[in-house]
A protein has these predicted regions:
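Positively charged, low-complexity terminal tracts
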Residues: 1-125
């Protein structure tokens, strides 16, 4: 049996998730002076096939009503990236304006990821 993690996002949540993914990826690549996947640390992960699969899944989800379907290792990458992003970007819960909206969206996204992690869909291999 294989675990599949399914997450449904609103358009606004998915846009926020994609924006975070793009900024994290660009910051990672900028530190390495280029688009080289090998031997690059991506928020603690090697730039490997799981990161590439997450990249592909993000593209597919945009075409599939903002729904992600991830296997365990790819799900782990997404969850780790989002937790680290939240930790590295100090959000003041009393803030107002655009920062407040991102703070709320990041919390919603992390809740959906966490909930999905508790209820994987089991599929035959």
């Amino acid at each position: 049996m294989r675990e599949i993690f399914e997450m449904h996002f609103t358009r606004e949540e998915f846009d926020c998730l994609q924006s975070i993914w793009q900024s994290v990826r660009q910051a990672t690549w900028a530190r390495q002076y280029g688009d080289q996947w090998s031997n690059v640390k991506f928020y603690g992960f090697e730039m490997n096939e799981y990161v590439q699969l997450l990249e592909y899944a993000m593209t597919r989800a945009g075409e599939d009503n903002n729904t992600l379907h991830l296997t365990r290792p790819v799900f782990d990458v997404l969850q780790s990236v989002m937790i680290k992003y939240q930790q590295e970007n100090i959000f003041d819960p009393n803030m107002v304006g655009p920062g407040r909206k991102e703070f709320e969206l990041v919390n919603i996204i992390l809740t959906k990821i966490t909930d999905s992690g508790k209820n994987p869909i089991l599929v035959e291999e």
